[in-house]
Every structure is written in structure tokens, then in C-alpha cells.
Amino acid sequence: MRFAAPLLLIVAAAPLAGCGAAHDPALNEQQAAAAQNRAPDRDKVMADRWSGIFTNPAAVVAAANDFGFKAEGYRASGKGYAATGKVTWPEKPNGIAVESVFEATGPAADRIETVRFTFDVKHDAKPGERARDSYGYVRRIVLGFLSRFEVGPGDTINGALQRRESAKDVQHGVSIVVDANPISGGNAKDRHITVTFTRVGASAPANQTQGK
């Protein structure tokens, strides 16, 4: 009988421990749903995934480098932190060249507030037969980057990327802006396209391009 009291304490404490785990703020929505034995809230799951872009600089740099940007890392720069990289597609000229710059900026080593891709899409006077295959580079890079975090840009932004037009939208706490303009003095089809992802509520300095 002398073991009865401790046994009762253990049994009584078990439900409390379970409740504590279910409400642990360190858990994401999928983990919390599993702990509470319920279906996850899709909006919260997507918000968690988008948040991962801004709370994991190493993963962001790795995702950009998957597409050849060769960013060296998220490092102290000016009044904050930044990672940058450049790449040109395709490797062999075929009537079109896509010069691209990747930038991630933020106020701290563990936090990003803005991710930006800039594309200069330039055409020869008479693009080759393979040039049409290169028109989709901008969209493929942006969607490919986002897919690393299991998110997508939504129909509005996806359509703008397909048409190389300007647009803006907000997805799960993230502002997405596509700014597409002709390149002065270039071919009529040439475009300067900037795709910017900003955490809603980001501070002004993090929204500015480093070094400008």
C-alpha cells in the first residue's frame, strides 16, 4: 500500500503532461494537431511553412543555391544581415539570356524579412528556336524555390509570372510583389522583373536592397 500514493500522483500528472505538450508554443501546427489527436488547420500549416522562409536563413540560401545562385551565406552586412548570389541562364546562348540576382535581407542572423529575385530577360533581335523554351525561366525559378518550403505563390502571382506582368498579393502573412517593366533600349520583349517576398510587418531597413 505504501506505493499507492506515488502511483496516484503519476496517473494524475499524465493528463496534465499531455495538455502541456499540446499547447507547447514550440510546436508547429502539424505537431500540435498530432499531439491533440486532431486534423491540422490548413491555414495554420501554410502559415508555418511560409514562416520557415523567414526563420531559417541557411535553408533559404541552400534553396537559392539549388538554382545556381552561389550565395556564400547569410552574413552581417551594413545595419543587418544579407545573402546575395547571381546566375545567368542558359549556360549556352540560344537567343535569350536571363540574368538573375538573389537577395535575402534581415535584421538578425536568425531572421530574414525580405527575399528578392531580380531577373533581366534579354532577347536577341531574332531569337533562336530554343529561345521560347527559356521564357519560363523566371516562373520556374520562383516556383522551384518556393517548393523547397512546400508553398506556392497563389493564382494571382503565378499568372503574373506566366505573362511577365506586375501584380501583388498576400499569402499567409507574406506580401508578394511582382514588378515587371520593359528594359530601356532593349528588345520589345525584354523585361526587368523583380519578385519580392516580405514578411508582413517587416521593418523598413529590411525592405531595402543592401548597398543601395
In which residue ranges do the predicted regions lie?
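Bacterial N-terminal signal peptides that target proteins for export
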Residues: 1-8
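Long, charged/polar, surface-exposed segments that mediate recognition or autoinhibition
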Residues: 100-162
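Short, low-complexity, Pro/Ser/Thr/Gly-rich segments in the mature regions of secreted, periplasmic
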Residues: 190-212
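A cross-family detector of function-defining hotspots
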Residues: 65-108, 147-185
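Bacterial signal peptide processing site
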Residues: 19-22
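Post-signal peptide N-terminal segment of mature Sec-exported envelope proteins
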Residues: 27-52
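Short, non-transmembrane alpha-helical segments in secretory-pathway proteins
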Residues: 47-68, 137-156
